[in-house]
Amino acid sequence: MKAKVLAGAAAGLTLALGVPAAHAAPLTLVVDNVCSAKGEIDLTVYVAADWLSTRTEGRDRQLPAQVGSVTFQFDLPPGTYAAATFHDANGNGKFDENLLGWPLEGFAFSNNAHVRFFRPPSFAAASFTLPPEGATETLHLDYWTKC
Protein backbone atom coordinates (compact mmCIF):
# COMPACT_ATOMS: atom_id res chain seq x y z
CA MET A 1 0.00 0.00 0.00
CA LYS A 2 2.78 2.39 0.96
CA ALA A 3 4.56 1.65 -2.35
CA LYS A 4 1.38 2.52 -4.33
CA VAL A 5 1.00 5.82 -2.46
CA LEU A 6 4.66 6.71 -3.08
CA ALA A 7 4.41 5.77 -6.76
CA GLY A 8 1.28 7.90 -7.14
CA ALA A 9 2.92 10.83 -5.37
CA ALA A 10 6.01 10.56 -7.59
CA ALA A 11 3.86 10.49 -10.74
CA GLY A 12 1.89 13.52 -9.55
CA LEU A 13 5.08 15.41 -8.75
CA THR A 14 6.50 14.58 -12.18
CA LEU A 15 3.39 16.00 -13.86
CA ALA A 16 3.32 19.06 -11.60
CA LEU A 17 6.95 19.89 -12.35
CA GLY A 18 6.37 19.55 -16.08
CA VAL A 19 8.92 16.77 -16.49
CA PRO A 20 8.26 15.13 -19.85
CA ALA A 21 6.88 11.63 -19.81
CA ALA A 22 9.27 8.80 -20.66
CA HIS A 23 7.41 8.16 -23.92
CA ALA A 24 7.69 11.78 -25.16
CA ALA A 25 9.67 12.52 -28.31
CA PRO A 26 11.63 15.75 -28.80
CA LEU A 27 10.24 18.06 -31.48
CA THR A 28 12.20 21.07 -32.68
CA LEU A 29 10.35 23.60 -34.81
CA VAL A 30 12.45 26.30 -36.47
CA VAL A 31 10.58 29.35 -37.75
CA ASP A 32 12.77 31.11 -40.30
CA ASN A 33 12.52 34.20 -42.53
CA VAL A 34 11.63 36.36 -39.49
CA CYS A 35 12.01 39.88 -40.92
CA SER A 36 12.12 41.95 -37.70
CA ALA A 37 12.62 41.69 -33.96
CA LYS A 38 9.30 43.41 -33.23
CA GLY A 39 6.69 41.48 -31.25
CA GLU A 40 6.54 37.71 -30.87
CA ILE A 41 6.45 34.54 -32.92
CA ASP A 42 3.30 32.61 -32.00
CA LEU A 43 3.30 28.87 -32.77
CA THR A 44 0.77 26.11 -32.14
CA VAL A 45 1.19 22.37 -32.73
CA TYR A 46 -2.07 20.63 -33.60
CA VAL A 47 -3.47 17.11 -33.88
CA ALA A 48 -6.07 16.38 -36.58
CA ALA A 49 -9.04 16.77 -34.23
CA ASP A 50 -8.15 20.36 -33.27
CA TRP A 51 -6.57 21.66 -36.52
CA LEU A 52 -6.71 25.46 -36.47
CA SER A 53 -9.58 25.51 -33.98
CA THR A 54 -8.24 24.83 -30.49
CA ARG A 55 -5.02 26.11 -28.98
CA THR A 56 -4.00 23.43 -26.53
CA GLU A 57 -1.93 24.27 -23.47
CA GLY A 58 1.48 22.69 -23.81
CA ARG A 59 1.31 22.87 -27.61
CA ASP A 60 0.92 26.66 -27.91
CA ARG A 61 3.95 28.91 -27.38
CA GLN A 62 5.14 32.44 -27.97
CA LEU A 63 8.78 33.53 -28.13
CA PRO A 64 10.29 36.98 -28.73
CA ALA A 65 10.87 37.65 -32.41
CA GLN A 66 14.43 37.97 -33.66
CA VAL A 67 15.62 38.63 -37.18
CA GLY A 68 16.42 35.37 -38.95
CA SER A 69 14.96 32.42 -37.05
CA VAL A 70 13.31 31.44 -33.78
CA THR A 71 13.48 27.87 -32.42
CA PHE A 72 10.73 26.17 -30.41
CA GLN A 73 11.22 22.94 -28.40
CA PHE A 74 8.44 20.51 -27.48
CA ASP A 75 8.26 17.05 -25.91
CA LEU A 76 5.22 15.27 -27.33
CA PRO A 77 4.05 11.68 -27.73
CA PRO A 78 5.07 10.22 -31.09
CA GLY A 79 2.33 10.72 -33.67
CA THR A 80 1.06 12.89 -36.49
CA TYR A 81 1.01 16.66 -35.99
CA ALA A 82 0.79 19.90 -37.95
CA ALA A 83 1.98 23.35 -36.90
CA ALA A 84 0.88 26.89 -37.67
CA THR A 85 2.80 30.03 -36.79
CA PHE A 86 2.60 33.77 -37.27
CA HIS A 87 4.73 36.83 -36.52
CA ASP A 88 2.67 38.92 -34.09
CA ALA A 89 4.72 42.02 -34.90
CA ASN A 90 2.43 44.45 -33.08
CA GLY A 91 2.10 42.22 -30.00
CA ASN A 92 -1.70 42.28 -29.88
CA GLY A 93 -1.96 38.48 -29.50
CA LYS A 94 -3.89 37.87 -32.71
CA PHE A 95 -3.26 37.30 -36.41
CA ASP A 96 -4.10 40.56 -38.17
CA GLU A 97 -5.80 40.78 -41.56
CA ASN A 98 -7.17 43.68 -43.59
CA LEU A 99 -10.87 44.08 -44.44
CA LEU A 100 -10.53 41.70 -47.38
CA GLY A 101 -8.85 38.99 -45.30
CA TRP A 102 -5.36 39.74 -46.66
CA PRO A 103 -2.74 38.79 -44.02
CA LEU A 104 -0.94 41.76 -42.48
CA GLU A 105 1.58 39.62 -40.57
CA GLY A 106 3.93 36.84 -41.63
CA PHE A 107 2.61 33.28 -41.28
CA ALA A 108 3.56 29.70 -42.09
CA PHE A 109 2.39 26.11 -41.86
CA SER A 110 4.42 22.96 -41.36
CA ASN A 111 5.31 20.72 -44.29
CA ASN A 112 5.61 23.90 -46.41
CA ALA A 113 1.82 23.84 -46.88
CA HIS A 114 0.41 26.90 -48.64
CA VAL A 115 -2.77 28.95 -48.51
CA ARG A 116 -5.04 28.38 -51.50
CA PHE A 117 -7.72 30.92 -52.41
CA PHE A 118 -7.46 32.52 -48.94
CA ARG A 119 -8.09 29.16 -47.26
CA PRO A 120 -5.58 27.56 -44.91
CA PRO A 121 -4.17 24.17 -45.89
CA SER A 122 -5.79 20.96 -44.70
CA PHE A 123 -4.33 19.06 -41.77
CA ALA A 124 -3.18 16.36 -44.21
CA ALA A 125 -1.27 18.92 -46.30
CA ALA A 126 0.47 20.43 -43.26
CA SER A 127 1.04 17.26 -41.25
CA PHE A 128 4.29 15.54 -40.36
CA THR A 129 5.17 12.44 -38.36
CA LEU A 130 6.96 12.70 -35.02
CA PRO A 131 8.82 9.41 -34.53
CA PRO A 132 9.95 8.18 -31.07
CA GLU A 133 13.51 9.42 -31.67
CA GLY A 134 12.25 12.98 -32.38
CA ALA A 135 12.23 15.32 -35.36
CA THR A 136 13.08 18.81 -36.56
CA GLU A 137 10.78 20.75 -38.88
CA THR A 138 11.25 24.19 -40.43
CA LEU A 139 8.41 26.65 -41.05
CA HIS A 140 9.24 29.45 -43.51
CA LEU A 141 7.35 32.68 -42.71
CA ASP A 142 5.58 34.26 -45.68
CA TYR A 143 4.84 37.99 -45.54
CA TRP A 144 2.17 39.24 -47.96
CA THR A 145 2.92 42.83 -46.99
CA LYS A 146 6.17 44.63 -46.21
CA CYS A 147 7.62 43.82 -42.85
Question: What label would you give each PLM region?
Answer:
Residues G8-G18:
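Bacterial N-terminal signal peptides
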Residues D42-Y46, A84:
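Beta-strand signatures of extracellular beta-sandwich domains
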Residues A89-E97:
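Acidic, glycine-anchored loop motifs typical of Ca2+
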Residues S69-L76:
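Exposed aromatic-hydrophobic patches
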Residues G106-K146:
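Extracellular beta-sheet/turn segments enriched in Thr/Pro/Gly and aliphatic residues
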